[in-house]
Amino acid sequence: MSWQTYVDEHLMCEIEGHHLASAAIFGHDGTVWAQSADFPQFKPEEITGIMKDLDEPGHLAPTGMFVAAAKYMVIQGEPGAVIRGKKGAGGITIKKTGQALVVGIYDEPMTPGQCNMVVERLGDYLVEQGM
């Protein structure tokens, strides 16, 4: 299965009539493996900040997390594994696997829990596959 198929079929899938606004899978170095058509352009320093927060949980909390120049308030995640962010009526979930970052961005009416479920389910599967 291609990385694009994971994005199209597993991240951009419909959940209770809703779907993510955009999604992507990155390498730990920030290389885009696959993304939805309207996924925002990450800056290299944003990926660096995300990886640092995954290595040193709490790094982004004081300043917020920037994604494509949009600021997200960092909310509780799983130290070293998941970062969650909130911005207005939407937010972001980032799941770290052995080799990748699985990213989902949502807006209302999708809920934070639905975004978390979609992103973390694929991330957990990739971890089980050694990815």
Swiss-Prot record:
Coiled coil: none annotated. PROSITE patterns: PROFILIN. Keywords: Actin-binding, Allergen, Cytoplasm, Cytoskeleton, Disulfide bond, Phosphoprotein. A motif (Involved in PIP2 interaction) lies at residues 81-97. The modification Phosphothreonine is found at T111. The variability of the residues taking part of IgE-binding epitopes might be responsible of the difference in cross-reactivity among olive pollen cultivars, and between distantly related pollen species, leading to a variable range of allergy reactions among atopic patients. This is Profilin-3.
